């Protein structure tokens, strides 16, 4: 049996990339981060390869699927949302912490279209991104719970309701930016926050989505963005 015929040993560490391969990988990730920021997660991979100065074949050798590229690019980006949630929990007044979290989340989405897309989607094969998002959702639950226990945030608001805030903000941002009103989200958020206050609460006409329904919706959006038909 030749060396080439021997089965690979999964316990052995992967060989480090050659210098040129590492340079290409870093260039692809940097280009993808900028293209996704500007155009969202459905941006053409050909444009990423062009900006990275590599051929599309090189891109696919490094990242055989869009999801693998997303996983490499987005984990650090999504971490910014985790830091916002941690800062929100450090604010003394629970309502101020809740409002801070929503405002900074919308601000991040306005600055980075790809990040906005990622926060409204689930990618079952992007382990690094999903691990960060799971940590984020734990922190956001604490932000909401703290504000509700203080009596300032309406008691019937759920985490699933907040998913709609993210979806709505992400989808409308490109249109209002093109219309010359990139900060229009601030007015919309102020109206939403007024509706979230406990003292202004009225009975809601429809039950919230269940966690399972929101998860399924986010998976559907993630599959569409990643071009995954399965």
Functional labels for PLM-detected ranges:
Residues 125-175, 182-187:
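Amphipathic alpha-helical packing segments from all-alpha helical-bundle domains
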Residues 1-50, 68-71:
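Basic, helix-initiating cap at the start of DNA-binding domains
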Residues 27, 47, 96-104, 161-165, ...:
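Amphipathic alpha-helical interaction segments
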Residues 117-126, 207-209:
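Short linear capping/connector segments at secondary-structure termini
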Residues 72, 79, 83-111, 124-139:
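Hydrophobic alpha-helical connector segments
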Residues 1-12, 138-149, 175-230:
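C-terminal peripheral helix-coil segments that are non-catalytic and often amphipathic
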Residues 53-63:
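Short hydrophobic/aromatic patch on the recognition helix
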Residues 40-41, 61, 154:
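Helix-turn-helix/winged-helix DNA-binding modules
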